C-alpha cells in the first residue's frame, strides 16, 4: 500500500518529502513507511529484509488461510505484486524495492 500511495503521489507531482510529512501525520502513518522511506528516497535497496523473504512469509500466510478456509483477498494481491518484483530481479534486494516495480508499471509512454 505504501508503494502504491507513493507512486500515486509521484503521478500527481507530489514530492516525496511532502508525501511523507502528510502521511506520517495522518491516519496513514505506519512503521514500515517510517522505517523504509529514507531507503526509498536514496534508492538504497541493500537488503534489510529481502523481498524473497516477504514472498516466503506471504506464501506461508496464504497456505494457513487456505487450510483454515479463510478468505485472503488482500494477501493474494500483495503476494502477486511481490512475485512480480521477484521476476523483475528484486528478490535479493530489500522488500522496499517493490516501489521500483510499481513506479515502472505506472510510467506512461512518452
Where are the predicted features?
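Helical "substrate-binding/catalytic lid" subdomain
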Residues: 1-105
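ATP-dependent carboxylate/acyl-activation modules
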Residues: 109-110
Amino acid at each position: 500500500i505504501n508503494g502504491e500511495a507513493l507512486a500515486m503521489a509521484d503521478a500527481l507531482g507530489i514530492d516525496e518529502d511532502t508525501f511523507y510529512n502528510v502521511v506520517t501525520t495522518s491516519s496513514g502513518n505506519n512503521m514500515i513507511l517510517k522505517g523504509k522511506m529514507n531507503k526509498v528516497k536514496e534508492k538504497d535497496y541493500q537488503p534489510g529484509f529481502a523481498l524473497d523473504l516477504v514472498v516466503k512469509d506471504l506464501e506461508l500466510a496464504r497456505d494457513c488461510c487456505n487450510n483454515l478456509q479463510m478468505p485472503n483477498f488482500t494477501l493474494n494481491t500483495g503476494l502477486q505484486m511481490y512475485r512480480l518484483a521477484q521476476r523483475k530481479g528484486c528478490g535479493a534486494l530489500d522488500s522496499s524495492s517493490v516501489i521500483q516495480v510499481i513506479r515502472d508499471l505506472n510510467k506512461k509512454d512518452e
